């Protein structure tokens, strides 16, 4: 199973969500395969959000069993509004299409705890089979 990345993303294990339809596709596919999703909602102009990119990528590299998504709140406003994102960065843990945890703010230790706990509690071991076209 492999996640194919969009052009320009390089070796990143974090998938950038470009539109609402992509969000729905990623969350649905991960849910259908029993994989959790961790989503980072940020903005290109938000320094605290940008400061979390390295840690988020690091977590994605060490947890291939979880689908990591990045959503720019300015580019995908509909999803940001649906989830009630009011500050950046905001991180969501999603399982079976439901938000099970939310962290607001640049707190790398808390995000790591959330990711580590989700990997253990969900007992997933293989990466989601998501293809980005």
Swiss-Prot record:
UniProt xrefs under CDD domains: TRX_family
InterPro entries: Thioredoxin-like_sf (IPR036249), Thioredoxin_domain (IPR013766), Thioredoxin_H-type-like (IPR050620)
Domain Thioredoxin positions: 1-120
Disulfide bond sites: none
One Pfam family per UniProt: Thioredoxin
SUPFAM superfamilies: Thioredoxin-like (SSF52833)
Sequence similarity: Belongs to the thioredoxin family.
Protein name according to UniProt: Thioredoxin-like protein CXXS1
Record lineage: Eukaryota, Viridiplantae, Streptophyta, Embryophyta, Tracheophyta
């Amino acid at each position: 199973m492999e996640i194919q990345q969009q052009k320009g993303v390089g070796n990143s294990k974090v998938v950038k969500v470009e539109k609402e339809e992509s969000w729905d596709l990623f969350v649905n596919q991960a849910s259908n395969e029993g994989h959790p999703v961790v989503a980072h909602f940020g903005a290109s102009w938000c320094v605290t959000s940008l400061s979390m990119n390295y840690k988020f990528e690091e977590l994605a590299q060490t947890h291939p069993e979880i689908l990591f998504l990045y959503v720019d709140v300015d580019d995908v406003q509909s999803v940001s509004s649906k989830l009630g994102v009011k500050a950046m960065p905001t991180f969501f843990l999603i399982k079976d299409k439901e938000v099970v945890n939310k962290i607001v703010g640049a707190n790398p230790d808390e995000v790591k705890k959330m990711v580590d706990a989700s990997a253990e509690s969900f007992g997933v071991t293989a990466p989601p089979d998501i293809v980005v076209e």
